[in-house]
């Protein structure tokens, strides 16, 4: 039998780990500069927690049955778990709370092949207790994150879940799910099959995307309700704040997979020569925390998640990521069995020096001839060999290439 990971899972080997840690560390440094603090939530949660009151479909969750706990699941995203943690564990916290995470998620897509990837790694933020001004902070933080990675080409697609949902409410209730699904899939053909009096309004909603000024102009021509105009005004203010800091498309047909968003939603997309790649997504969810509170009390929230695998693929061709594993600077070799304890002590001394935080020291674990030891050190690109006598005295040798 050949032992392999189960379908949908994969091993991540040391060089790829180092490359992804490079990405994570730069993102975390950016989060720290913006005063975000790390939170860790369980990989395994109760299924009702993960479903977020019906906003997340159960078929996307890898599920387990436990005799005592009932239905459990592996988290398909982090926002619901963090919302639950904020309500149940942070009752006395002072808001706003700025939180970030770096974690794996597990997600099934309906109709996906069994061999399709089901484990992913995400790094993201949640800003809890922030009003509309938090929208601007999150978009500017997103920009800072991507700049910290030296990402070559990217743009943001910005939507407004509350406004899109409100515009959909003009259609007959029984047709709203069909129209919503068609718009989410950009399925113009499905919309042309609607009754004649609904066809053009649905197509108009689908076409509310493009250059922001143009979309806002088209919105101004619609007969909007006061609350809809208020949302449009907020969008204008947000777009003025962002300005031309990064390329942005306004798209009111943007509908996210998870249905807990109530305000702005956005995708960040890499726009390379070969293909477009979704790097992350986010949005505002002002009612989510109420679903976990016994009294239904809520706090506004907004956040985003960046997909580590996709960032990794986009950054690989740039040459920024580590191209090889760090090598040891020292190889410590006891010259005979009586020198083993002294060799370990010498290695410990090297590692304990104040300036040795990044120093890599390894012990020779096999009894090799001096020439075989030197060849090993050359192959591993080790800088120095320390030959240790029983009394602890070292003979230092620089490894010649």
Curated annotation (Swiss-Prot):
Presence of keyword Cytoplasm: yes
SUPFAM superfamilies noted in UniProt: Class II aaRS and biotin synthetases
Biological process according to GO: histidyl-tRNA aminoacylation; L-histidine biosynthetic process
GO cellular component, one term: cytoplasm
Gene symbol of the encoding locus: hisZ
Pathway: Amino-acid biosynthesis; L-histidine biosynthesis; L-histidine from 5-phospho-alpha-D-ribose 1-diphosphate: step 1/9
Annotated organism of origin: Cyanothece sp. (strain PCC 7425 / ATCC 29141)
Keywords: Amino-acid biosynthesis, Cytoplasm, Histidine biosynthesis
Pfam family, one: tRNA-synt_His
Protein name as catalogued: ATP phosphoribosyltransferase regulatory subunit
């Amino acid at each position: 039998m050949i032992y392999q990971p189960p379908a949908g899972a994969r091993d991540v080997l040391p060089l790829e780990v180092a490359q992804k840690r490079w990405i994570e560390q730069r993102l975390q440094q950016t989060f720290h500069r913006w005063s975000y603090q790390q939170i860790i939530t369980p990989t395994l949660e109760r299924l009702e927690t993960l479903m977020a009151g019906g906003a997340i479909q159960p078929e996307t969750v890898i599920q387990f049955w436990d005799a005592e706990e009932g239905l459990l699941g592996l988290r398909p995203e982090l926002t619901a778990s963090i919302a639950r943690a904020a309500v149940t564990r942070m009752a006395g916290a002072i808001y706003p709370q700025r939180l970030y995470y770096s974690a794996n998620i597990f997600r099934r897509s309906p109709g996906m092949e069994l061999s399709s990837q089901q484990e992913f790694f995400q790094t993201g933020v949640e800003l809890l207790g922030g009003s509309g001004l938090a929208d601007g902070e999150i978009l500017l933080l997103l920009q800072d994150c991507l700049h910290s990675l030296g990402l070559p080409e990217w743009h943001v697609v910005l939507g407004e879940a509350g406004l899109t949902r409100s515009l959909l409410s003009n259609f007959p209730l029984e047709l709203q799910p069909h129209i919503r699904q068609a718009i989410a899939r950009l399925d113009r053909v499905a919309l042309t099959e609607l009754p004649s009096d609904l066809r053009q309004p649905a197509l108009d909603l689908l076409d509310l995307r493009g250059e922001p000024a143009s979309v806002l102009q088209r919105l101004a021509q619609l007969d909007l309700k006061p609350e809809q105009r208020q949302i449009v005004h907020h969008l204008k203010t947000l777009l003025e704040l962002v300005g031309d800091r990064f390329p942005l498309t306004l798209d009111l047909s943007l509908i996210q997979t998870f249905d807990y968003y109530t305000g702005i939603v956005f995708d960040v997309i890499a726009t390379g020569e070969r293909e477009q790649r979704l790097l992350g997504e986010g949005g505002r969810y002002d009612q989510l925390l109420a679903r976990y509170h016994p009294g239904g009390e809520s706090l506004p929230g907004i956040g985003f998640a960046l997909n580590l695998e996709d960032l990794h693929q986009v950054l690989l061709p740039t040459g920024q990521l580590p191209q090889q594993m760090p090598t040891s600077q020292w190889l410590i070799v006891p010259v005979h069995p009586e020198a083993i304890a002294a060799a370990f002590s010498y290695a410990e001394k090297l590692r304990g020096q104040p300036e040795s935080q990044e120093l890599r020291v390894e012990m020779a674990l096999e009894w090799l001839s001096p020439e075989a030891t030197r060849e090993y050190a050359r192959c591993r690109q080790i800088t120095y060999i320390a030959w240790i006598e029983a009394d602890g005295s070292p003979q230092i040798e620089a490894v010649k290439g």
